[in-house]
Amino acid sequence: MKELLYTALDVACIIDMEGLSVQEAVLLAQRMHAEDKSFLAMEYRQNYRKWLRDILYWSDYMQDKIALDAEFPSVQAVSDGTMDVSALMRDDFNLDLFFKRLRVQILYFGEQDYARMKLRTLMAKYGYQRRSKDFVRFLKIRFVFYHIQTALRGNEICDVETMDSLDDMITFRVV
């Protein structure tokens, strides 16, 4: 479950995706540290300064990712080939980022206390075409961890495993 906790890199990615200014990013970091401390990686729970510093570091990286990634081969040459550059140049930082971003959007960004999406769209984000048991288990673990409740139109609580149609609109709420 450690991988489900927010890291500074996760928050920097969310900041980049949302196009937040530095001032908005600092406010988000403050609120998350104050209100969602139990969801932060252990190293940040008691150290706001490190939390903010690391978020700003990764945010800076996200702003100029292409140029910095281009420098990695020369860094590896200087390190005598002991550094694994491919691990640092990933574009998919974390598949769980979708759920982390969903929680942040609902709690901190939106005027609404919910988000909506079709199950088919959610599956497409992960490259799934069928509602497999592994995918449903993956979803349920994240829904429970992030306290996300799913409902159909009319606030009818639903289970993604037993929904009739993949094209039903799901409402996500943090409870």
Model-found features: residue ranges?
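Short glycine-rich, basic-tinged beta-strand/loop micro-motifs
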Residues: F109-R130
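C-terminal edge-of-domain segments
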Residues: E156-V175
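Structured alpha/beta or helical-core interaction and ligand-binding surfaces enriched in interleaved
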Residues: E18, N94-R101, R131-S132
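Hydrophobic membrane-targeting and insertion signals
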Residues: M1-Y6, I14-I15
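Charged, low-complexity interaction regions
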Residues: I14-Q23, A34-E43
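Short helix->loop/beta-hairpin flanking segments within DNA-binding domains
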Residues: L97-D113
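Charge-enriched amphipathic alpha-helical scaffolds
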Residues: E35, F39-W58, M123-V160
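Long, low-complexity, charged/polar intrinsically disordered regions in eukaryotic proteins
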Residues: A41-L97
